[in-house]
Every structure is written in C-alpha cells, then in structure tokens.
C-alpha cells in the first residue's frame, strides 16, 4: 500500500481520488439536507441589478441589512462598554443570530474579558494579576441593523452608535430581557483575550480555604470560583510542577495558594480544542454565545481529507 500511495496515488491524486471525493461531497450534502431535491442552484443569480419593486417586496432581507461591521466596531464597544481598564474586547468581534419575535436577527456579540495587557502597574504584581483579576464580566450584544439615531451633520458626535444589549454583574438591562439574551452566570474565565498575555502566563489561581473571597467581581464585591475547570494545586507536588512550568516560586510560597486552590490555564478556547482534538482543523476565530443562560465559546472545527 505504501508503494502504491507513493508512486501511483500521490503524483495523480486528483484523478485517483476523484471518485472518493465525489462520494464524500455527496454524503456531506445529504447529511446537511443540501441535495438537489431540496436546493435550487442558479448560475450568475446576482448578475442583474435588482429592481425597485423587488427591493421593496423583499422585506425580510432589507430589514436585516447590517449597519454595524464586526471587523471595525470593536473600538466603539471598548469606548462605551469597557467599564474598567482591565476589561476589554477582541480587535475583531463576531456575528451571531438570536430568535427575536420568531425571526432570526443578526447581532454583533462580544464577551467582556479580562485583558492582562491592560493592567496598570499597581495591578501587575503576582497576587493581583493571578489571584484577583481572574475573570471577565458579561455579554454585550448590539443589533447589527440598528443604531441609536442617524448622524445628520458632518463631524457630528451624535448618532450612529450601537444599541447595546447588556447582561453583566451590575445589571441585566430591559432590552436583554425583552430579547431573551439574559445571562445567569456572567463571569468569564476563558477566552482569547484572557489568553493573550504577552509573557504567555495567562493562568489564574482560584479557590479559598477560609471562605474569604479575593477575586474582583465589582467595586463592592468579590468572588470565589465555583466551576469544575482547573487542576488541583492543593498539594506540594502539583504546586512544584506548575512552579517549574511557569518559573514562578509564588506558586509554592504564597499563602494565596491553599489546599482548595486550583489553577486555570490554557485559557484560549481554540487552543483547548487543539489540545484534546488535534485532528480537527479549527476556524481562526471563536465567538461567544448565550446558551441556556450561560456564556459559552463556539469553536468551529472541521475534519479534512
């Protein structure tokens, strides 16, 4: 088989494997319900301009035309929804759809993550960075086809801003309730921005032995991680292993590390998928979604020939 593959198949792969590729494509179309009896294929369907009558009659499309571009709107999200210097949003945001009044509507969506690269000097010591500023806060969405008002004058700072729907620790706005995008657990411990630390040390040490919470939640409250993630570092052997990995003696010496402590690491959702399923080819971006009241990261993965 190896000789056949090397001297016959590889030099003529397109011809030799065309039959099997065709079967794969046919099976994929069948699995996704894209067979010819269900889908009509039209050549050059967009070559002719649409008439005014056709545009006027296509209410579903026109009413959902995007006014917000997820590739360029991130600075506006940051300016209006960052809240604290240590929170942030990715440079490029994502699109998602939610069922509003029995219709799927486009939203620009983002998770308000901890940004380790935005911490001030007094926030960068080991205790603050790895045991206090551990998680993000909330889900922010904006209808892609809406802005607050039209900017009527050139250079005007009024109008053209997103209409935000916010669910976070401080509030769940009425708009979120009406649209059904309500988050029951707004704390975010994993995400691409969280994992973007320039020194590669994106880990967080969580868990309390005394019941005293130390993780920053809001200006008036703290929190202790209650999730199932992370690795137990309550014993000296695990502490030593992670201390060696990150070249950090505080993991052994600090009183913040106790018998109930866990370490959260490898916090980029896409990289986590690569670790457990290296045979998958993943999309270059991940995006957050509200599912059953929780913020979850969607990673699109594909098997390839």
Name what the model sees in each region.
Residues 1-305:
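Soluble extracytoplasmic regions of secretory-pathway and membrane proteins
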């Amino acid at each position: 088989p190896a000789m056949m593959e090397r001297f016959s198949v590889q030099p003529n792969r397109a011809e030799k494997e065309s039959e099997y590729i065709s079967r794969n494509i046919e099976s994929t179309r069948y699995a996704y319900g894209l067979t010819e009896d269900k889908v009509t294929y039209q050549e050059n369907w967009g070559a002719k301009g649409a008439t005014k009558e056709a545009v006027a009659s296509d209410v579903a499309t026109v009413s959902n035309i995007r006014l917000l571009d997820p590739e360029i709107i991130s600075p506006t999200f940051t300016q209006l929804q960052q809240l604290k210097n240590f929170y942030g949003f990715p440079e490029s945001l994502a699109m998602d759809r939610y069922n509003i009044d029995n219709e799927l509507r486009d939203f620009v969506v983002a998770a308000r993550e901890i940004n380790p690269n935005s911490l001030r000097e007094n926030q960068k010591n080991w205790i603050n960075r790895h045991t206090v500023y551990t998680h993000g806060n909330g889900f922010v969405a904006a209808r892609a086809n809406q802005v607050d008002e039209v900017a009527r004058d050139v250079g005007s700072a009024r109008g053209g801003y997103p209409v935000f729907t916010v669910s976070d620790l401080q509030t769940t706005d009425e708009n979120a309730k009406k649209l059904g995008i309500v988050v029951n657990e707004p704390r975010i411990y994993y995400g691409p921005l969280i994992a973007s630390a320039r020194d590669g040390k994106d880990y967080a040490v969580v868990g309390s032995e005394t019941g005293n919470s130390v993780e920053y939640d809001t200006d008036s409250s703290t929190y202790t991680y209650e999730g199932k993630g992370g690795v137990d570092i309550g014993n000296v052997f695990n502490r030593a292993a992670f201390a060696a990995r990150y070249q950090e003696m505080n993991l052994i010496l600090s009183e913040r590390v106790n018998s109930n402590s866990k370490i959260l690491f490898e916090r980029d959702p896409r990289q986590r998928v690569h670790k457990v399923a290296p045979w998958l080819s993943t999309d270059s971006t991940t995006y957050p979604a509200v599912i059953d009241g929780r913020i979850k990261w969607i990673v699109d993965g594909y098997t390839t020939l």
